[in-house]
A protein has these predicted regions:
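Metalloprotease/metallohydrolase-associated module, dominated by Zn2+-dependent proteases
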Residues: 94-150
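Pan-zinc metallopeptidase signature
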Residues: 126-195
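Post-HEXXH active-site segment of zinc metalloproteases
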Residues: 74-105
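Short pre-active-site segment immediately N-terminal to the catalytic Zn-binding motif
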Residues: 46-63, 104
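Surface-exposed patches in mature extracellular/periplasmic domains of secreted proteins
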Residues: 1-7, 24, 79-84, 124-133, ...
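Auxiliary, metal-adjacent structural segments of Zn-dependent hydrolase domains
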Residues: 1-43
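Solvent-exposed loop/turn segments at secondary-structure junctions
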Residues: 10, 29-30, 52-55, 69-70, ...
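Active-site recognition of the HExxH zinc-binding catalytic motif
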Residues: 61-78, 110-114
Length: 195
């Protein structure tokens, strides 16, 4: 999705002075490189990392995971995704235990990515592989809600809007989407907050 990012990306921590200087050296050139080079016109929207994927199941799962991010991007757009990328640039792929600027955006994105990856991969290949992601992401919660039919993948996808910037906001959107299951959704997401 990098070719489609039109908003600035860069380091975004709690130290504004450090971020300023780092972004002059790192963030600004990265944004300009993405938006004003050949990357903009020929880079693929999705890159599937095949390294260390030694089975069809693993490659299929990785493909589903990355395509789930592409579907999420289609819902939220460039400004939201620039915050996601900036979080990863600042804190690493899964960050630091739901801390830092835009951690919630990463949590929602990875929760969706791993949950749909596991749901579809397990449906195709059988078995029960469930990724939590980092401990604070807890994709298993969303996976179980979908697997048990409490919410559908379409329900979750419909909730992935630019307003959903934390897992708690995702919970509230799912409760509004499925009011009959309000308490079940609340209970499942409570396990997220208690870990």
């Amino acid at each position: 999705m990098l070719p489609r990012i039109t908003h600035p990306i860069g380091r975004d921590s709690n130290c504004e002075l450090a971020d300023f200087f780092i972004n002059i050296i790192y963030g600004l050139p990265a944004t300009l490189f993405i938006n004003h080079t050949i990357i903009e016109s020929i880079a693929p929207d999705v890159i599937i990392g095949g390294k260390n994927r030694t089975s069809s199941r693993a490659f299929y799962g990785q493909t589903i995971h990355e395509l789930s991010h592409a579907s999420h991007f289609s819902q939220v757009g460039s400004a939201y995704w620039a915050k996601y990328i900036s979080y990863i640039m600042t804190y690493g792929a899964y960050g630091d235990d739901n801390k830092g600027e835009n951690a919630g955006i990463c949590g929602v994105g990875e929760m969706w990515g791993y949950a749909i990856e596991d749901l579809l991969t397990n449906d195709k290949y059988g078995g029960l592989d469930i990724h939590k992601g980092a401990d604070w992401i807890r994709a298993d919660i969303l996976h179980d809600l979908m697997k048990e039919g409490i919410v559908s993948p379409n329900d979750v996808f419909d909730c992935l809007t630019p307003l959903i910037t934390t897992q708690n906001k995702l919970k509230e959107a799912l409760q509004a989407k499925s009011p009959a299951n309000h308490n079940i959704i609340e209970t499942r997401f409570d396990t997220l907050n208690n870990n």
